Amino acid sequence: MVSATRWETAIEVTPWIAAIAEQVPLFGTDGIRGRVGEHLTAPLAQQVGFWTGQVLRQAGGDRGPVVVGQDSRNSSNMLAMALSSGLAAAGVEVLHLGLCPTPGVAYLTHHSEAIGGVMISASHNPPGDNGIKVFGADGSKLDRQLQAAIEAGLRGQQTSLPATTWGQHYYQPQLADHYQAAIAQSLGQRANLQGLKIVLDLAWGAAALLAPRLFRELGAEVIALHDLPDGNQINVNCGSTHLARLQAAVLEQGADMGFAFDGDADRVLAVDGRGRSVDGDHILFLWGRELEQQQQLPGQAIVTTVMANLGFERAWQAVGGEFVRTAVGDQYVQAEMQARGAMLGGEQSGHILCRHYALTGDGTLTAAHVAALVQASGVSLADLVDQSFRPYPQLLRNVRVEDRDRRCNWQNCAALTQAIAAAETDMGDRGRVLVRASGTEPLLRIMVEAEEAQQVEHWTTHLVQVAESHLL
């Protein structure tokens, strides 16, 4: 660190940033996220960095660096530099990893003397969006109380912590090698994927370099798609939200399986050798059965969200397992897992948390363990999926509702609530409806699932029509 004088005047809370912080909570279900140049700017990132540094110093005993990583978006470097300057102004040293998956930032934060970590990414969002995710010293996502303290600082309502030094910025991309090695070590005696042909869709994102290198070092034959960091194409018609290219490649290459990551690689979905998608529900079921057989799943508990398929729930309960649902968002899953002492949880979308190895969702680690699980089983991933459970037909449709009040308070729409009640009456205990406002995009998400596909299609279409007629 370098000596500083009157450091407290280095970062000034400007009125327009204070106004942004006053309007709505900046932190959503997965950090701060928005359109770059509109909601998310370099001046805002700098002040978020400053107040993040202040809050982490107070929570972490006023010593230790902050680990910063980023995905491949064109705006990520700009925002990382702005945020790092704010951290330095708060008297915090910055260890900048450069391109690194979000779980890599969490891992390196936890396994170092860092007081926190920050990831610049908007996960699965389009290239024009970006975000800021903050982690505590233990590598878990920052709790709501500390997020609120950062927001209070941005509003000019927080007192800064006195200091007499500037922080320094150190570019240390080689630290990500420790994260890669930790994934390999977590496999133990099964760290050998020889004989498996695996297709990886890296989504032009944060895992573009690390994941193929890891799987090749484990002995797998790897076919890599979208495997360069490309800020113009990140998540565009590829990755975990667009599986078609991966499915086609698995079939064309005669591969055993494939894995698709999102832009920051904290989630993953799989494709089996028949080209079928394998979502987070199936991954949780298969990994849960393995952990239970190894007596590493306390209470046979799996924690997931309200989005999990009814077929998954009933199949897990049928084998004696405990099935716990939370609100959507991996931070809610993580909190419930910690409260219950559960070791496995996640989301249908591919955020998988295994507390034997990590405190956050980790797409690369999950993919490696699924591949090792298949290798050890002696049968194909397709066969394992067929032996697990039959999911209920499920449809998820998004309705774009720009008006935040209407979107977040959709329950006030009588026509929509009446339509939902009619659907629930019709399906009884053989189906369900879930309507919720997205925490990361201006979308109202409408999900219907039931034993009969015709019912699902009918009620999904009807509910979308009602929402579009009364909320837009």
From Swiss-Prot:
Mg(2+) binds at residues 123, 262, 264, 266. It catalyses: alpha-D-glucosamine 1-phosphate = D-glucosamine 6-phosphate. Pfam families: PGM_PMM_I, PGM_PMM_II, PGM_PMM_III, PGM_PMM_IV. GO terms for biological process: carbohydrate metabolic process; peptidoglycan biosynthetic process; UDP-N-acetylglucosamine biosynthetic process. Its EC number is 5.4.2.10. The active site is at 123 (phosphoserine intermediate). The modification Phosphoserine is found at residue 123. Keywords: Isomerase, Magnesium, Metal-binding, Phosphoprotein. Its cofactor is Mg(2+). GO terms for cellular component: cytosol. Disulfide bonds: none annotated. PROSITE patterns: PGM_PMM. It is an enzyme of class 5 (isomerase). Binds 1 Mg(2+) ion per subunit. GO terms for molecular function: magnesium ion binding; phosphoglucosamine mutase activity; phosphomannomutase activity. Activated by phosphorylation. HAMAP family: GlmM_B. Belongs to the phosphohexose mutase family. Catalyzes the conversion of glucosamine-6-phosphate to glucosamine-1-phosphate. This is Phosphoglucosamine mutase. It comes from Synechococcus elongatus (strain ATCC 33912 / PCC 7942 / FACHB-805). The lineage of its organism: Bacteria, Bacillati, Cyanobacteriota, Cyanophyceae, Synechococcales. The gene is glmM.
